[in-house]
């Protein structure tokens, strides 16, 4: 990205970061409310189908809100923030083989339990699980490594642009903790920051 494409003031940079974060939350919230309302009237044959539709809705709505603010609010392009539909072959390979590897490890150290799901239900559950991961991964990467990182880099420097989004990434995951302990929160912040870097 050419840094001369935009040069926001400190306050404008912080406001833009806040707006993108709120759009990130709004995409998920509005999608959840819409699908919960819709499916309170329409019954689906499977909970996994609900998850599939909700994750697709959240992904598309969040991406649309990001695009709308970027192009109409800031009069910039998505590629100005490093966001392009360019998919690398090695990325696809890693995204397929890493879950297979992790599943194999769990299968070796865990115990098998027989479930009563049909083949169709198992397929829906697998697709739902993949969409949960894709939705989270894509929208979080757009927010933290796209918008926030590029805004901070444009205003300050690459070190701040790497550290702050990584730290914010870890803070966003605190509410997903099952139990709150000081050591648990500190471990999440440290590991989330390291993963983000």
Short names for language-model regions:
Residues 1-78:
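N-terminal, membrane-interfacial amphipathic/helix-forming hydrophobic leader that caps
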Residues 5-13, 44, 81-85, 116-124, ...:
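Helix-boundary and loop/linker segments of multi-pass membrane transporters
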Residues 29-30, 184-197:
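Functionally important transmembrane alpha-helices
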Residues 48, 87-89, 122, 155-160, ...:
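Membrane-helix interface segments
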Residues 72-75, 103-116:
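Transmembrane alpha-helix boundary signature
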Residues 111-119, 173-182:
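Membrane-interface helix caps and helix-loop-helix hairpins in membrane proteins
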Residues 158-174, 189-192:
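Small-polar-interrupted transmembrane alpha-helices in polytopic inner-membrane proteins
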């Amino acid at each position: 990205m050419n840094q001369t494409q935009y040069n926001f003031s400190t306050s404008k940079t912080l406001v833009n970061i806040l707006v993108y974060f709120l759009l990130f939350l709004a995409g998920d919230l509005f999608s959840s409310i819409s699908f919960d309302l819709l499916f309170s009237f329409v019954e689906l044959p499977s909970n996994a189908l609900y998850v599939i539709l909700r994750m697709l809705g959240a992904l598309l709505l969040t991406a649309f809100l990001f695009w709308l603010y970027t192009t109409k609010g800031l009069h910039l392009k998505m590629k100005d923030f490093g966001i392009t539909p360019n998919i690398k072959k090695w990325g696809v390979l890693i995204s397929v083989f890493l879950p297979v590897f992790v599943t194999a490890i769990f299968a070796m150290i865990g115990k098998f339990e027989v479930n009563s799901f049909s083949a169709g239900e198992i397929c829906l559950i697998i697709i739902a699980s993949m969409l949960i991961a894709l939705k989270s991964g894509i929208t979080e990467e757009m927010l933290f490594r796209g918008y926030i990182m590029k805004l901070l880099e444009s205003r300050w420097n690459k070190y701040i642009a790497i550290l702050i989004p990584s730290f914010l990434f870890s803070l966003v995951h605190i509410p997903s903790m099952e139990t709150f302990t000081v050591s648990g929160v500190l471990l999440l912040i440290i590991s989330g920051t390291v993963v983000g870097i």
